[in-house]
Amino acid sequence: MIAYHADHVGSLLRPSGLITAREDAAASRISQARFKAIEDRAVEDAIRLQERVGLPVITDGEQRRLSFQSRFAESVSGLGDWDLNAFLWGHWHGDLSTVGDVTIERPAGLGVVEKLQRSRYLSVEDFVFLRARTTCTPKIALPSPSLWANFWSAQSSRAAYSTLESFLADVVDILREEVAELVRIGATYIQLDAPHYALLLDPATRSFYESQGWSAERYLERGIEMDNAVMGDFPGVTFGFHLCRGNQGSRWLASGGYERIARTVFRRVRAQRLLLEYDDARSGSFEPLKEVPEDKWVVLGLITTKRPHLETMDELVSRIREASRFVPLERLAISPQCGFSSSVIGNALTPADQERKLRLVVETAQRVWGEATRTATN
C-alpha cells in the first residue's frame, strides 16, 4: 500500500487560456488539434506545479475535464443531452462576501435514454500522458458509480432501464473495466470521488433519492457495494476514497459531520485511504474517525480550497494531533479539503494562493512526520 503523509484530491485551477480555448473549440473557432495542444500544455504546467512544491502524488489537475465526473459522460453513449448543470444542480451556499448562495435547477430533461455503450476509456490516455511526464506517483480519480443515480429518471429512462438498479449495474461494469485497464497499464493509485454520500445529510438530497425509489440508507449501502465492485481486488494498487460536501465556485451543498455515514462508509468501503473534508466547523468533529478500521489511512482535508486565507502551520499541527486521538498518527496524512476546481468554474482563489496552500501541505507533513513521502508495502 502507498503511504504518503502529503496528498491532494486532484483538481487544480484552470488557466484562463484553457477556459477560453474550450469555449473556442466548442464553437469551432479553433481546431480540436489546437485545443488538444493547449490542454497538453496546461497539464504539463499542472505537473510542474505539483513537483515544484514537493507533492509525492501527481495528478493532471483534471485540466481536460469539464467537471470531475464529466469524463464518464463524454466516454459513453446513451445519456441523452447534458451540460455542466447536470453535475451541479442543487442549492449552493457561500460564505465569502463576494460569493453568495445560488440555486441551480436539475435539468428537466436529464436522464439516461438508451443502453449505455462505452465509446472509449475514460482516463487511460490521460494516465499514459501523466505517467510519461513525472517520476512521482501518478493518481487518477474516477466518479463513484452510484453518483450517476442522478441520471436515471422514472419519467424518461424506463425504456432503457426499467429500474435504477439495472442502470447502475451497467455503470459499475464500465467503471470496473476502466479500473482493470488502468491497473493493467501500471496505475498504482486510483481514487473514487463520492461527494454524494455526505450530501445524504441534506434533507433535499435525501428526498430526491427517495423519490427514485431508494431510501437514503439503501442508497448508501448499495452504493458502497458498487464502489467495492469497481475497486475489486488488485494487489499492489492503493485506492483512495474522497468524501466532501460539494465544492463549486467556493460554495458547498451540505453541512454536518460524518456521524450518520461513518460506520457504513469507513468500515465497509474497500479503499485504503479515506480523503475527508475537515476545513471548517461545518465539517463536524473528528469523533467519527473512531469508526476507521486499522487497515485504513485517513487523509485530513484541513486546508481549505474555498478561500484564499492561508492556514497557519501551528493550527494544522494542532488539528492533526487532535485527530490522532482517534486514528494513530502514523496512519494520518494531510491534504486540502477538496480540489481547487471541481469543474471548469474554479474556486475564488488565485494560482498563487493555490500554490501556497499546496506547499503548506508538504511543509506541514514534513514538520509532523519528518517527511512528506513514504512508500510502504503491507
Enumerate the language-model features and the residues they cover:
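Domain-level signal for soluble alpha/beta catalytic cores
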Residues: 1-378
